[in-house]
Amino acid sequence: MATYISLITETQLGETHIDESVARATRIREEAGKFGVTVTGMYWTMGEFDGVLIFDAGKDEEAAAFLHHVTSKGMVRTRTLRAFDSDSARSILQKVANKE
């Protein structure tokens, strides 16, 4: 499974309905399985981004479908990063080192 980190920004519509934010997030967590995705973390944040969503997916296509679902109501926008754990990073960097 691949890990993804999505940085969440509320839209103007999302800000208007901010009192529903926790309920929306709960619904998203419950619906994730329909897309082959497991949500492993949800955080509301201060600063440039309003929240962080961390999830695992077996394929990029599953992650993309899930994110389209998350943003489809127009409440939030996302900026998503593919994340690597230390074992994966080690493997990637060893390949780089062996190329030289």
Question: Model segments located where?
Answer:
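Short S/T/G/P-rich N-terminal loop/turn motif that feeds into the first structured element of a domain
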Residues: 1-33, 38, 46-49, 88-100
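Short, well-ordered beta-strand segments in beta-rich or mixed alpha/beta enzyme
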Residues: 4-9, 43-66
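A short linear hydrophobic-aromatic micro-motif
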Residues: 36-43, 78-80
